[in-house]
């Protein structure tokens, strides 16, 4: 059992020995989430979790009337949960993921805004700072490449570089940085560029620290988005590896048509290049 904190939600990850069927429902007074998992039991005892800064107060286990494993999440307030199962990927086996979103924050986001009437004036050319979206690769469940000797994790290296780069951008007149992630949590690949677009970013920089077979490799590589896709075998291998991050980091694809998603993603990339 692991807990991750992101700015907009708290994530709980249950490692399971195989695929599981689960049923989730909410209780109030006090706020709780109940998860019944069929044909399951807890191996050993649950680890103590640091719940500071999260929506979770405590985790308890027991048995339901039907004999299923029952997990009760005591909450600090009203939440809107989302749960899904993940198949094995990378170093991880089967997982059950429960994301807890702050209900009040979500309600505020969806409230329709009624703009005040404006006088019609000649439009002036927009002048603003150049916004640079800085994306630290991987994060949370997805460590990225891991060093063989010191077990250095790519997600930590990329975040440190992103934070330093943001400082440099902030010091440059006419430029403003935005960090796609600013902590140890996972952001889905599609959500990364969606966040950049919501902030009207002009430049998107994704930072990675990949591993290669040869120990003599050093220096850096720069990849630019191409309408023709990966231009060589190394670029294709790197692209396939990074695009698989959602399976490791934990993004549900149950509600998406995978072929449609890929087509829309390709169209979106091409449109971005043309713009």
Model region roles, listed by residue range:
Residues 1-132:
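Signal-peptide-cleaved, periplasmic/extracellular N-terminal interaction regions immediately downstream
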Residues 49, 56-59, 146-147, 238, ...:
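Short clusters of hydrophobic/aromatic residues that line enzyme substrate/ligand-binding pockets
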Residues 111-258, 269-274:
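Catalytic-core regions of hydrolytic enzymes
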Residues 261-267:
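Flexible glycine/proline-enriched surface loops and loop-helix/loop-strand junctions
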């Amino acid at each position: 059992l692991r807990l991750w904190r992101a700015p907009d939600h708290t994530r709980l990850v249950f490692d399971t020995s195989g695929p599981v069927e689960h049923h989730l429902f909410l209780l109030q007074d006090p706020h709780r989430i109940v998860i019944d998992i069929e044909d399951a039991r807890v191996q050993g005892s649950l680890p103590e979790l640091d719940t500071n800064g999260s929506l979770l107060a405590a985790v308890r286990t027991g048995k339901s009337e039907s004999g299923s494993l029952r997990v009760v999440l005591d909450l600090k307030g009203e939440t809107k949960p989302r749960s899904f199962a993940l198949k094995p990927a990378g170093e991880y086996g089967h997982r059950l993921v429960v994301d807890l979103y702050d209900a009040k924050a979500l309600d505020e986001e969806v409230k329709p805004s009624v703009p005040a009437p404006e006088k019609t004036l000649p439009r002036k050319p927009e002048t603003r700072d150049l916004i640079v979206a800085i994306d630290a690769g991987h994060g949370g469940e997805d460590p990225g490449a891991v060093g063989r000797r010191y077990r250095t994790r790519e997600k930590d290296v990329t975040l440190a570089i992103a934070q330093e780069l943001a400082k440099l951008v902030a010091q440059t007149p006419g430029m403003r940085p935005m960090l796609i992630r600013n902590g140890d949590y996972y952001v889905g690949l599609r959500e990364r560029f969606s966040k950049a677009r919501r902030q009207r970013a002009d430049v998107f920089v994704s930072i990675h620290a990949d591993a290669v077979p040869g120990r003599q490799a050093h220096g850096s590589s720069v990849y630019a988005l191409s309408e023709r896709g990966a231009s060589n075998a190394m670029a294709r291998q790197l692209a396939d590896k990074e695009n698989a991050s959602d399976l490791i980091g934990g993004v549900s694809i149950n509600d998406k048509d995978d072929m449609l998603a890929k087509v829309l993603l390709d169209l979106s990339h091409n449109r971005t290049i043309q713009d």
